[in-house]
């Protein structure tokens, strides 16, 4: 008999709960998906045009491992302008294959076996499995709806042990749309410094905040040297398929992460890097137009959920809304499956984002207003039917 070819680590990890409903809806005619967190806009034309031009010019070879110098310079300028933090493009910035690679490389570079990583939930599905694959121990901090799923200093303090090394800060948050203001972040930063922790700040939705600007924890006093900032072009610039992100932080950490990136990836896609330079230099207006459209959809959904009397707070980040369905006495997966089967609309059960997401749904508004209105009509009908059956 052949030995088991698979590691215990990988067989113990469940596939993403997000993709399950996306795969199901793709097989249903007339179905609407509000499940995938991907912009419905085309990549801005100037970015695409630059990509075409660089291909025509034959710029199809490897770049340096850490990325094109001009791109890192533009990223440095962008971050100084947006989050008011200066990063040395030569030593403190590494270009990655999407923000997801940055998360993976950061955890693998910083964790020894048994190191604990604090992960507020509900949050993006990759943090826990990537921590496990890096031989770390994920420790979940359940966030509370009553305070808009924000992390508090008291919750953080209670979760810290002598083995704690890192805190993940997933804000603006997927799936809740929650943001952290400067006033929210300051007590968190004090706890982090007092316990000598590092922060992995996933800021991929930083371009998508409404009514208030994004604040990075790295901008607070004493935090740049203990924070790794993850960002990229997928969400704000509508470049999901270009697979381009970056990670910024102390040079002593970036230099070691570069080894993993070197051996596993070599470099991020050359064509995408040239295109992103154009995006950072010239596409701020297009990014603002997309943000305005998301904001219009956000306001529409908040109002519609209020009319349906589905409890949810008003989100000010990303492109998700996170209504409660606890009144119906079923799990979020049961609700989502019935909604899909009966009304042909896909949403993601909150449980896909951790146990504290149970009883909620993630509804993406990265879809046209026409699709949202049709989906809301079907949801209203479904909710009325459930309430009549009580």
Mark where each language-model region is.
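Conserved nucleotide-sugar phosphate-binding/catalytic loop shared by glycosyltransferases and other
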Residues: 57-59
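PLP-dependent class I/II
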Residues: 3-6, 11-14, 24-28, 32, ...
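Conserved N-terminal alpha-helix of the aminotransferase class I/II PLP-enzyme fold
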Residues: 62-97
């Amino acid at each position: 008999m052949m030995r088991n070819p698979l590691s215990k680590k990988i067989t113990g990890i469940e596939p993403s709960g997000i993709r399950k409903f996306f795969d199901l809806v793709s097989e249903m005619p007339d179905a609407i998906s509000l499940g995938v967190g991907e912009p419905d806009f085309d990549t801005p034309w100037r970015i695409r045009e630059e990509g075409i031009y660089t291909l025509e010019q034959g710029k199809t070879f490897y770049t340096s491992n850490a990325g094109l110098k001009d791109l890192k310079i533009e990223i440095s300028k962008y971050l100084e302008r947006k989050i008011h933090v200066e990063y040395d493009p030569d030593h403190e910035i590494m270009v990655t294959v999407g923000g997801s690679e940055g998360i993976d490389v950061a955890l693998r570079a910083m964790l020894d076996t048994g190191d604990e990583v604090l992960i507020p939930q509900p949050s993006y599905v990759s943090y826990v499995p990537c921590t496990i694959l890096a031989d770390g121990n994920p420790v979940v901090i359940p966030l509370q709806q009553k305070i808009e799923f924000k992390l508090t200093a008291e919750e953080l303090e209670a979760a810290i042990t002598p083995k704690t090394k890192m805190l993940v800060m997933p804000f603006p948050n997927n799936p809740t749309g929650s943001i952290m203001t400067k006033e929210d972040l300051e007590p968190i930063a004090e706890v982090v410094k007092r316990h000598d922790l590092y922060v992995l700040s996933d800021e991929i939705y930083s371009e998508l905040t409404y009514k208030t600007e994004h604040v990075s924890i790295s901008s607070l006093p004493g935090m740049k040297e203990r924070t790794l900032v993850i960002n990229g072009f997928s969400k704000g610039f509508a470049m999901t398929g270009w697979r381009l992100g970056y990670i910024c932080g102390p040079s002593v950490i970036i230099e070691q992460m570069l080894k993993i990136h070197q051996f596993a990836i070599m470099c991020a896609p050359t064509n995408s890097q040239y295109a992103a330079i154009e995006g950072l230099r010239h596409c701020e207006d297009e990014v603002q137009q997309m943000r305005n459209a998301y904001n219009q959809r956000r306001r529409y959904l908040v109002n519609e959920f209020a009319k349906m009397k589905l409890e949810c707070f008003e989100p000010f980040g990303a492109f998700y809304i996170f209504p409660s369905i606890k009144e119906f006495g079923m799990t979020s997966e049961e609700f989502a499956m019935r909604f899909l089967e009966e009304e042909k609309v896909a949403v993601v059960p909150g449980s896909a984002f951790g146990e504290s997401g149970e009883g909620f749904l993630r509804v993406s508004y990265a879809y046209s207003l026409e699709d949202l209105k049709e989906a809301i009509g079907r949801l209203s009908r479904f909710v009325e039917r459930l309430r009549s059956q009580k």
